[in-house]
Amino acid sequence: MNRSVLDWPAGVTVYHPDRCYNGYTLVHGRGPWDPVRGISAEQVDRWHLIDMKGQVVHAFYGNPATQRGSQLFERVANGHYISNGASITEQDWDGNIVWSLSSDFREDARPTGFHHDIQKTSEHTYLAMVADRIDAPQISRVTLKDDHIMEITSEGEIVWEWWGHHHLEEFGFSDRAKQIIFETGGGQQPGQDGDWLHLNTLHTLPDNPLYDQGDTRFKPGNILSCSRNGNQIFIIEKTTGNIVWNWGYLDQMETMWLNGTEGQNQYLVGPHDPKMLHNGNILIYDNGGGTGYPPINRFYTRLVEINPVSGEVVWEYAAGPQASKFLSIVTGGVQRLPNGNTLSLDTDKGRIFEVTWEGEIVWEYINPRGGFYRTQRIAYPDCPLDPPDPKPADLPVPDHLGLPVSDTLDYCPSP
């Protein structure tokens, strides 16, 4: 059974300095929009940079253009920080907005806001996603929210784009799954448009040994994405727009057949945030829950690393015999650190943790203001701060709430 956030202590609860990749960590600092209290959008979307002891060393405002707060706030290669929502915003360390683009920049668009992920692909180009409202009778009799990926210049020119509804057959859905999508639109709340794919990730492939060995599916610059409602991750070939690789989708009957066999870990349920590592493997946040057509149920979250050529799972982390204590069914993120550890979070609880290859938790932080979408560990040299002593004493695990807990613990952005 999951514990309530109120059952957890707050702040840093585990820290083994010699086994961590010591640095700074981004955490969301405020709760949801509250017009009754008069909390401003800037206050809603405040992000904190904390040290390994949980002390706030710097603060940012995320995306003041949206009352919901940014789903994403990350450091990019040039040292700036990007966020999304009603607009894409890039800011410097001091919070100066150096570039911004509203999601209504397309004259023919019905603005929905930039959702989930954004990637800065060069000094002047960005990958972003919106959800276009379309009628696609070849896919569904229900009006759909169709994921639309765009590469946009800093001048607001679209130089490349991709739509999900052009590629139905490439996702590998079974006939039964396609019939469910046709009848229901898939994935939506009652009375809403069909959220048939629900993409949540944009990741351009880095240089990797798979492409060096001649496998053109993994060409650097191709786009790795993730369909939460379709239970799969996939690669888009940049030059053609075709889906050239996917992994994780199985029909419900196939997963039942695999139950209790060695292949039972070869499928995904509601995944988020896949990333190709420099060894060519792919790291995934596999949420669990109940998604798919028809839904597949798995009530624990796991982190998995796969070999994309063989499909083999080469590393997996879940919470052992009490796996359901690590369950985040709607959001999540994962980051492989330079020392081989993995940073992730139990988003529903606001719990961030660093885990070794062997499955040992060597750092843990409980956000006193509850859940948020993603986190990021940033190296000391990448922040204009004097680095702390990298080997402070271990902190004991408190037996009480060490920090005040706000009344916004149920905050969680759209999955």
Feature locations, PLM:
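Histidine-/acidic-rich catalytic cores in large beta-rich domains
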Residues: M1-P415
